[in-house]
A protein has these predicted regions:
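Histidine-centered beta-alpha loop that forms part of the nucleotide-sugar donor binding/catalytic region
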Residues: 8, 54, 107, 134-135, ...
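Structural signal for interior beta-strand "rungs" in well-ordered beta-sheet cores
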Residues: 242-333
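Short internal beta-strands
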Residues: 50-54, 132-133, 294
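Conserved beta-loop-beta/alpha segment of the NTase-like Rossmann-fold superfamily
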Residues: 60-149
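Catalytic-core segments of class I nucleotidyltransferases/pyrophosphorylases
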Residues: 102-103, 110, 116-123, 136-139, ...
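N-terminal glycine-rich phosphate-binding loop and ensuing alpha1 helix
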Residues: 1-61, 312
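A structural signal for short hydrophobic beta-strand segments in well-ordered beta-sheet cores
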Residues: 25, 145-147, 198, 209
Length: 333
């Protein structure tokens, strides 16, 4: 079975990290997001993946130099201009020569969804397309999906106000689609699957949804990226995948709590790191405090950062204090 994986976004919420590294290639517990996603798809029966690319395609080619991810064959569809979700799906599916039933997945979603179960539900229902749903605590922050007892989608409610809907289920970013849906997604112009294609399918009664309680997180924001790293690191059993990588250099007097630390990281004496992700290249000076942050650059001695992102060329000067800062501030040329 084929899958289209949407990875063409700019990753604006994770800048300045994503000026250098496309968001789906950022590691989650030491493994690039895209590899974790493709491995999950493979467990559900996917044999071929086409990446719908736009921004910075070259790093993806480098990540898969033999065009394989495990046993999954990788191909690429590079947009010359952004096509939005449905446009990208139509373009990539045609580029890969997809026929029959196929999967669509968002490249920045981490989930334990059993894709084979979603496909089985899709086939039982006779749907043209099926979307996975996940329960959310605050429906006002999501596009909420209402279904009937059989799972047929009745309507979408975008960021509902209190009392506007009883549903608490949001689209989880994984879809099963029939080849016939490509007629609604020509792939030649910008087109939104959420605002155009799905409503068309709802109108004809051909869109279904399956809700699960599987682990799910959109790792595309700073807070959720940190949370995804922590969540997945705690699920792993291999010492090489421990939250603090065995090859990281951590001073004996440093304190590291609820953080994920990559291999090529140095943490100095009396430094404190909590609720953060330190990526390859990060340097934390003596006495520095790092909280709720993502660091790939340098944090000087006795500096204190909270809710910050330090890119690969970012430098937090010794003694500097920052909340919500981005280092460097401007675009990296």
């Amino acid at each position: 079975m084929h899958a289209v994986v949407l990875v063409g976004g700019f990753g604006t919420r994770l800048r300045p990290l994503t000026y250098a590294i496309p968001k789906p290639l950022l590691p989650v517990a030491h493994v690039p997001m895209i590899r974790r996603l493709v491995n999950r798809l493979a467990e559900g029966g996917v044999t071929d993946v086409v990446l719908a690319l736009g921004f910075k395609p070259e790093p993806f080619f480098a990540e898969f130099p033999n065009n394989m991810c495990g046993d999954v064959r990788m191909t690429y569809a590079v947009e010359s201009t952004p096509l939005d979700t449905a446009g990208a799906i139509g373009f990539a599916a045609r580029a890969a020569g997809i026929t029959g039933t196929f999967i669509v997945a968002n490249g920045d979603v981490m989930t334990d969804l059993n894709v084979a179960d979603l496909v089985a539900f899709h086939r039982r229902s006779g749907a043209r397309a099926t979307i996975s749903l996940t329960p959310v605590d605050d429906p006002s922050q999501f596009g909420i999906v209402e279904t009937d007892a059989d799972g047929r989608v009745l309507r979408f409610v975008e960021k509902p106000q209190p009392g506007e809907t009883e549903s608490r289920f949001a689209s989880a970013g994984t879809y099963v689609m029939e080849e016939s849906t490509l007629a609604l997604m020509p792939g030649t112009e910008k087109l939104s699957i959420e605002r155009v294609t799905f409503p068309q399918l709802v109108a004809e009664g051909g869109l279904f949804a399956m809700a699960t309680n599987d682990y799910w997180i959109d790792a595309g924001r700073p807070d959720t990226y940190v949370q995804a790293n922590r969540d997945i690191a705690t699920q792993l059993r291999d010492p090489a995948d421990a939250a603090v990588h065995v090859d990281a250099v951590v001073a004996s007097s440093a304190v590291v709590r609820d953080a994920v630390v990559s291999a090529q990281v140095s943490i100095g004496e009396n430094a404190q790191v909590s609720n953060s992700v330190l990526l390859n290249g990060a340097f934390i000076g003596n006495g520095a405090v790092v909280e709720q942050s993502i660091v790939m650059g340098s944090v000087g001695s006795d500096a204190r950062i909270v809710d910050c992102i330090v890119g690969p060329t970012g430098i937090v000067q010794p003694g500097h204090v920052s909340t919500g800062g981005r280092f460097p501030e401007g675009e990296i040329s």
